[in-house]
Amino acid sequence: MKIIIKILYRIYQLLIALPLFALITIFTAITTIIFQHWRNSWWLHDIQAFWSRSFYYLLFLPVRVTGQENIDSHTSYVFVANHQSMADVFLIYGWLPVIFKWLMKAELRKVPFIGSGCKAAGHIFVKRGNTAAALQSLQEAERVLHDGVCTVIFPEGTRSENGQVGRFKRGALQIALDLKLPIVPISLSGCYEVMNRHEVFANYHPVHMHIGKPIDISTLAEENIPTAIEQLREAVIEGMDK
């Protein structure tokens, strides 16, 4: 019986959910491009958030979010999250209650509609392995991240192979230090079970996002950065059990 339900669920995804999500994606991208002058407005952000939420709505996936009370929507933060699958993006974009810009790999700029929409929305593209381009991205972030506009980073750098939290790279902490912004851990669970990096179809599974408490790193000394990175990783792992 479970096999039959799984087959029917995949047929539904292919014939109904995917076409509807594609239409919503095109509508959201076009709307964002047309109204990009208001890229930091709540009404445009809400349209983009609905696009992300529609991924979960169309697949009937239960979503639970905790820790919203830990942050202030008028304060700029650097959010760091574990990266289990593509489903992470839709969970964060749909339910993180702040206006934010992704720090995302430059290759995504070439994806039809999504790349153009992300550029119009003001998300920050980073060329990995290019120091000069990374510096330019940091300078762009300095211009954008103020008055409650935040950024979200996946410090592992790539999706998890097994759902476990990998090693955190220094970049996220360095950006928070350079911009003098508090850093907030986000813990995601269930997204790997929904769609890991090797799967094309989604699986039915509940997901959870926990927003941790802001961490002030403005006085962090250089020699303490490796320890702080590991403590941040531990905070993300701990939040997965909330």
Language-model-detected regions and their locations in the chain:
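Membrane-interfacial terminal anchoring regions of lipid-handling membrane enzymes
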Residues: M1-I33, D46, E69-D72, T227-K242
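Non-catalytic C-terminal accessory region of glycerolipid acyltransferases
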Residues: I4, L8-I11, L135-K242
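Hydrophobic alpha-helical segments typical of transmembrane helices
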Residues: W51, D88-L91, M104, F113, ...
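Thr-Gly-centered strand-to-loop micro-motif
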Residues: T66, L103-K105, K127-R128, P155, ...
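Generic preference for hydrophobic
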Residues: V65, F79, W102-L103, M209-I211
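Catalytic core of membrane glycerolipid acyltransferases/transacylases, capturing the structured
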Residues: T25-A49, Y56-F60, D72-T131
